[in-house]
C-alpha cells in the first residue's frame, strides 16, 4: 500500500490545536492499523528491526466488526498480526494501570502461541511475539526501560530455550530512556506519535518519516469521521467507568480491612478487660 498523500483541506498539515482522540485510545489505535496496512508495516519494521523490503505481508487476523460494541468486556483489545506468513505478532495499547497485566499478557501470548491445528507437527508452530504499549512500569520502576524484551532462558547459563515465545513492552512513560538502537529503529518516533496531544507535535514527527506521515493522515481522517469518534468516546467512557468501579472496590476493601482491624482491636480490649476483672476478683477474694 502506498503512502497516503495529504490533500489540501483534508490534511493533518492544516490542522492545529488539540487532537480529539489520539492513538493511545485503543479503538483509534486498532482502527488506524487495520485501515492503513502501510502504517502497520512501518510499525512492525521498527519494532522488529526489519527493513521495509523484508516485510512481504502483514495481515490482521482479528479485524474489528463494524457492528461490534466497544463498551463492554468482550471487546478485543489486542491486534493479532500475521507477518510474512511465518510469525504471529500481538499488539496491545494499554494506558490504564493493570495490576494483573503480566498475567494477562502471558495469557494473550499463550493463546497466540497455541496455534497448532489437529494433524500438524509441533515444528510448524510459528514464533509468537506479544508487544504491549503501556503507560506504566509492568515490572520494576527501579530499573525503567523504554523498550524491553523477555523470553525463556536457562537461569544458570542464560542460553535461550526458544525464540518462538517472546514478550516485549514499549513503556510510553520512558521515551527519554530510549537506547541508540531504539532511536535508530525510530521506535521513539512511534511512541511520540502515540502520545502526541496536538497536531503541531504530529507535524514535527512526520516531517522526515513517510510511515509517521501516513499514520498522521489516517489519524486526521479518523478524527473527522463521526462514527469513529463515537466509538472512541464510548471506549473512553467505558474505561473511565471501569476505573471508577475499580477505585470504589479498592476503597471498600480498604474500609473493610480497617473495620476488621478495629473489630480485632476491640476484641483484644474486651479480653484484656475480662482478664483484669478476673484478676481483681481473685484479689478481692483473697482479701
Residue spans for each PLM region:
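Short conserved micro-motifs at the rims of enzyme active sites and ligand-binding pockets
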Residues: 142-144, 179-183, 231
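Short helix-to-loop capping/linker segments positioned immediately adjacent to catalytic or ligand/cofactor-binding
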Residues: 116-121, 138, 157-158, 176-179, ...
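Short hinge/gating elements
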Residues: 25-32, 172-176, 201-202
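Intrinsically disordered, low-complexity linker/assembly segments
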Residues: 165, 171-173, 186
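Short acidic (Asp/Glu) and glycine-rich catalytic loops that position anionic groups and cofactors
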Residues: 20-23, 167-171, 193-197
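Short, charged alpha-helical interaction segments and adjacent helix-coil junctions
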Residues: 2-17, 89-94, 192-287
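A conserved mid-domain beta-alpha-beta active-site/ligand-binding segment of alpha/beta enzyme cores
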Residues: 189
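Accessory alpha/beta interaction modules
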Residues: 1-166
Amino acid at each position: 500500500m502506498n503512502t497516503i498523500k495529504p490533500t489540501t483541506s483534508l490534511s493533518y498539515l492544516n490542522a492545529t490545536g488539540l487532537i480529539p482522540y489520539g492513538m493511545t485510545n485503543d479503538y483509534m489505535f486498532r482502527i488506524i492499523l487495520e485501515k492503513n496496512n502501510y502504517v502497520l508495516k512501518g510499525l512492525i519494521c521498527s519494532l522488529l528491526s526489519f527493513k521495509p523490503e523484508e516485510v512481504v505481508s502483514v495481515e490482521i487476523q482479528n479485524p474489528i466488526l463494524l457492528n461490534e460494541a466497544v463498551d463492554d468486556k468482550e471487546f478485543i483489545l489486542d491486534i493479532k498480526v500475521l507477518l510474512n506468513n511465518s510469525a504471529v505478532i500481538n499488539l496491545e495499547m494499554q494506558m490504564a494501570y493493570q495490576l494483573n497485566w503480566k498475567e494477562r499478557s502471558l495469557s494473550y501470548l499463550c493463546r497466540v502461541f497455541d496455534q497448532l491445528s489437529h494433524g500438524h507437527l509441533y515444528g510448524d508452530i510459528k514464533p509468537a511475539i506479544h508487544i504491549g504499549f503501556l503507560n506504566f512500569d509492568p515490572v520494576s520502576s527501579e530499573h525503567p526501560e523504554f523498550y524491553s524484551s523477555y523470553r525463556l532462558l536457562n537461569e544458570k547459563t542464560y542460553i535461550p530455550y526458544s525464540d518462538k515465545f517472546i514478550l516485549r513492552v514499549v513503556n510510553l512513560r520512558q521515551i527519554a530512556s530510549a537506547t541508540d538502537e531504539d532511536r535508530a529503529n525510530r521506535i521513539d518516533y512511534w511512541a511520540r506519535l502515540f502520545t502526541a496531544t496536538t497536531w503541531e507535535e504530529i507535524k514535527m514527527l512526520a516531517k522526515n518519516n513517510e510511515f509517521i506521515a501516513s499514520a498522521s493522515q489516517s489519524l486526521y481522517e479518523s478524527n473527522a469521521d463521526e462514527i469513529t469518534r463515537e466509538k472512541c468516546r464510548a471506549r473512553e467512557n467505558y474505561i473511565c467507568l471501569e476505573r471508577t468501579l475499580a477505585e470504589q472496590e479498592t476503597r471498600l476493601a480498604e474500609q473493610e480491612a480497617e473495620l476488621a482491624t478495629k473489630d480485632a482491636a476491640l476484641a483484644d480490649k474486651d479480653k484484656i478487660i475480662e482478664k483484669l476483672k478476673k484478676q481483681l476478683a481473685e484479689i478481692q477474694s483473697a482479701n
